[in-house]
Structures are given as C-alpha cells and as structure tokens.
A protein has these predicted regions:
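Flexible glycine/proline-enriched surface loops and loop-helix/loop-strand junctions
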Residues: 27, 49-55, 160-164, 303-308, ...
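Short, solvent-exposed loop/turn segments at the edges of secondary structure
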Residues: 19, 38, 48, 64, ...
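Secondary-structure capping and boundary motifs in well-ordered enzyme cores
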Residues: 12, 16, 32-35, 39-42, ...
C-alpha cells in the first residue's frame, strides 16, 4: 500500500498534473476521496500513457481504458458484475481545469520560490558585476538552489513537482490580497494618463531617436514565441517583418480586463510596453518573513518579476543610507546644521559636478538641520555629506553592510541613487532601521516536508549587526519626520496616518522614469516601485514617487 501510495502521489497524469491530488483537481475538480469508481478508474488508466489515454485529447481511448480498469476490478471482486455493466454505460464527465501558473493568488511569488529552489550556481556571464554577491548568497543561503544541493536516498536531486514535497512559505494570504489589490488599483488609475500622453505626443519612448525606438521594438520582437517559431521555420528577415505587421486576432491585456481584438503583433508589443508596471513587497523586519510579494500587474502577460529580478535606479530612497553613514560613522546628528547652498563635487574623472534639485528650489544659504534636508529630499544635503565623507567607497561599503547586495559604483553620484537595486534588497535593507540596527535577510520559506510529513529542511534568516541601536532609532525618527513634514506627508493628509508609528521615503529617478516609496512601521517594512518596462517610456509630468508609489503603500496599510 505504501508503494502504491508513493507511486500515485508522484506519477504524471497529463495536463501538468503530478500526483493523484493534482489529477483529481485538474480533471474533476475534486479531492481524491470524493472521486467515484469510474473517475478513479479513469485516472488509474491514464498513468500508463498520459497522452494516449488523455480524456481531453483522446476521449474514446480514455473510455475504453477506463472500462478495462473496471473490468479488472470486477475480476478481483472489488465491484460486482452488475455494477460493472452499469458503470460501463456512464459517459466520461469532466470538469477540466488544467493547473496554470498564471492563475490564482501570489503568482509571481510562487514562480520566484520555484526558481530559487531550482537555482543553478551563478555564473559571471549571467550576473556581471553582481556575480560575486550572487555567488556568495547561493553558497551561504541554503534556500538558493536547495533542489540542486540536496539529494534523496537514491542519490538523485529533489524534484519539487514529482517528489510530493510540501513547501511552507511565510506569505500572509490576507496581506497578499491587500497588496495585489492596492497595486493594481493604482496602476489602473495611472494608465489613462500614460495613454493620453502617448495619444497627445504620438510617442511612447520619450527623448529617444526613431532609430533607438526601433531597436527597442526589434529587441522585443526577438524575445517572442512568434519570432522564434518563424526563425525555426526558416523565415527571412523580410518575411518576419511582414508577419509582425500583419493584423491577426489576439487577446491583449488592459486594466479593464482582457480584450479580444484585431492587431498586428508589432502593435501588440507597443501596446504592452505602454502598460504601466509596478511591484510591491512587505516583510516583518524582526523575523525577516516576507508577508506580501507582487512582482507585476499580471503574470500571464508580464512574466518579468520586478521585485527580485528587475533592478532600477533607486533615486532618493538611497538617501537614508547616506544620512545613516553620516550619523553612524561621522558622528553627525539630525540637528547638525548645514547651509542651504549648492555643493560642488568631483566626478570619477576629476571634473567638477554640482547636483541639481528637482523642481524649483531656492538656495538661500540659511542653515538647516540634516533632518530638514532628508525630509525635503534635498540633493545638496546628500552631496554635502559625500563631500565631508571624502570617500565614496566607504559609503558604498556601508550601504552593502545595510543589506544591499547589488553593485554600487563608488562615486559621489551614488548619493542620488544612481545604483540599480531590486525592491527585494531595498525592503530588506530598510528593515535594518526598524530592527534596532540588525540586518535580517528576507526569508520566504520556513520548512520543507517530504510526502510522509517528515521535515527534511528548515530555514532561518541570516542576521548581521549593521549599525548601532541608537543610530537605528535616530533614523526611524528621521523617516517618521518625512511623513510628518516631508515628501511623505500625504500618508497623514490623505490616508489619515496621524496616530500611527509610520515613516517613509519617496524616490523619483531622472525624468520620472522610476517612482519609489519605502515605508516602515515597527512590525512591517514595505516598498513600492512603479514605472514602465522600458525606462525611455515614462510619464513626463506627475510621475514622482509621492504621487505614484506612495498611494499603493497607503492603500495597503489601510
């Protein structure tokens, strides 16, 4: 019985269903215990040749095979002759619902978990400047590549689909629902502005030459299944181009729902590049448990995960780390007075460089405390700290210490957030402020059990001391001041967070290409990114982090 149970719980039944539980759900929308005799017989018959006896593709063969199984049951006295004759007359009644990774809740999270568990050893070609950090994480974090690092008693690696594993994650179902709703609600509200801008200007890619725009489109074409299929068929470049300019029936994504339309494949690429994207992640800063994870608006249409895979300029969300360096390493305080004047730094080429401010800003020379500069996200105050530090590499190393793994170019401009960093890293690093100066690596799996319920792996987050507890407390106060009298004040004025311990930092990259908001509370740290697939496509006006990203955090927290 144990051998049969092991077999039925792992064997392939077709339609991407492994194990009897998945098969019962896929073909009949039932639990195994709810199957009747003829349904159970059909599934038993399928396993010998899932395609040949598929009740979907080959119903006549499946019916004959089912009846053969029931005949054997009668011969072995599990059913009577009368029952056999009666059951043979029953047609196959499917409630076919194939398992799809595109459906359900937390689609990006589920795919991320699968990818991490199956992650191969990183290569330099794959990760470039981030190679050493990614290799170190793969080697030190047991979750990464777990299926490749661990082996069953027969010496083969684990298979998360075939081996009946139960993987327990940290995700909160309620928080995940809130996060998905908050993000998609905001993206749907923003999309008409982007559509109107493109209609008004006739351009999707801003400040981009026609040649550069065409390269973006051609590159996107090469990543499509249509393009690969045409190449495989031996189509010429001209034939491929003609095919992509020929209208066909297709289904496209909109925030009002999927739409069936007649469109050229080329225009469909432009349509989907015009769709506003976003991502969200929330974690418990004390335990490191990831509670909500949304990598994009719709996994079916946009597979690229903008929580963990995607990296963008983090803009002003880096500034709390720069201020933290000033306090923890240089002995400054939030009350350190700094003149409101332009600051000139040197570039890596030893040329003078004076950071500009966003919008209209007056340099009046008046002394203001550092907390004033952070609350207003002033570039000259971050530049002033870099000038006092005199060592961009020391600042970059400090930021890595806070929990950022991605490469940070050790130059003065890092103070304005020119580094490309993932939202996953940013949320983890911001948790250091709330967790009394201790960095806790975000964790998303707590344990793995085999099919018998035995725990074969358990995981706890890696922790490291990053800054002093006093510095962490000071930084939390400064982040809270941003919400009281800074760029995050909308959380109080619009969302009513007046009696809540909440802090945050907005971020807006050059020309509104990326909008960020990082929010912190005692038991939850969350981050939001909003932008387009291509950085050359963006809102010309009104694309600030306070306008685009902050509302997602506000709605989620409500």
């Amino acid at each position: 019985e144990e051998i049969v149970a092991m077999y039925l719980n792992t064997v392939f039944y077709g339609s991407n269903a492994y194990g009897i539980k998945a098969a019962a759900k896929t073909f009949f929308d039932k639990e195994p215990s709810e199957l009747n005799v003829q349904e159970a017989a059909l599934l038993v018959g399928v396993v010998n040749a899932p395609t040949r006896y598929s009740p979907v593709r080959n119903p006549e063969r499946a019916l004959a095979r089912r009846n053969t199984v029931m005949t054997r049951m009668q011969q072995n006295r599990y059913i009577t002759r009368g029952e056999l004759d009666s059951l043979k007359q029953e047609p196959i009644e499917l409630r076919y619902a194939p398992i799809s990774h595109n459906d359900g809740i937390a689609t990006y999270f589920r795919e991320m978990v699968r990818n991490v568990l199956n992650m191969p050893r990183p290569t330099k070609k794959q990760y470039g400047r981030d190679y050493e950090a990614e290799l170190a994480r793969w080697e030190s974090n047991p979750v990464y590549g777990w299926c490749r690092k661990n082996f069953k008693s027969d010496g083969t690696p684990y298979d998360i689909y075939r081996d009946g594993l139960k993987i327990y994650t940290t995700l909160s179902y309620d928080m995940q629902e809130y996060a998905e709703e908050a993000l998609c609600q905001q993206l749907a509200a923003i999309q008409p502005r982007m559509d109107a801008q493109v209609k008004r200007t006739g351009r999707l890619f801003i400040k981009t030459s026609n040649e550069a725009a065409e390269r973006i489109i051609q590159n996107a074409m090469r990543y499509t299944d249509r393009y690969r299929s045409l190449v495989k068929q031996g189509a010429s470049r001209e034939e491929i181009e003609e095919d992509f300019r020929t209208p066909v029936r297709m289904r496209i994504f909109t925030y009002k729902g999927e739409v069936d339309t007649l469109m050229t494949p080329r225009d469909s690429i432009l349509h989907h590049k015009q769709i506003m994207r976003g991502s969200f992640m929330a974690m418990n800063p004390n335990t490191g448990h990831v509670k909500a994870y949304v990598g994009g608006p719709d996994f079916k249409y946009f597979k690229y995960d903008m929580v963990k895979q995607g990296k963008r300029h983090i803009s002003s969300t880096i500034k709390p780390f720069v201020y933290c360096f000033a306090i923890d390493y240089m002995g400054m305080t939030p009350c350190t007075m700094v003149p409101n004047l332009p600051v000139t730094l040197e570039t890596e080429n030893m040329e003078p460089w004076q950071p500009k401010e966003a919008g209209r800003v007056e340099y009046d020379g008046v002394l203001h405390p550092l907390r004033w500069g952070l609350a207003r996200s002033r570039n000259n105050y971050s530049a002033w700290i870099m000038k006092q530090a005199k060592d961009p590499k020391a600042v970059a190393d400090f930021i890595h210490q806070m929990g950022i793994h991605s490469y940070i170019d050790p130059v003065n401009s890092l103070a304005l957030g020119t580094a490309d960093v993932s939202l996953f890293e940013m949320v983890g690093a911001y948790s250091t402020f709330v967790n009394k100066g201790v960095f806790t690596e975000p964790i998303f799996i707590t344990r793995i059990e085999d099919r018998q319920g035995n725990v074969i792996a358990s995981f706890v987050p890696a922790v490291s001391d990053a800054i002093s507890e006093q510095t962490a407390y000071t930084m939390v106060q400064m982040l809270q001041n941003n919400v009281i009298a800074g760029t995050g004040v909308r959380l109080r004025n619009v969302y009513g967070f007046r009696d809540v311990e909440v802090g945050g930092k907005t971020g807006t990259s050059q020309e509104n290409r990326d909008a960020w908001f990082m929010g912190v509370t005692p038991n939850l740290v969350a981050g939001v990114w909003i932008g387009c697939e291509d950085q050359s496509a963006h809102l010309v006006t009104g694309g600030e982090g306070a306008s685009l990203a902050l509302p997602v955090f506000g709605e989620f927290m409500k």
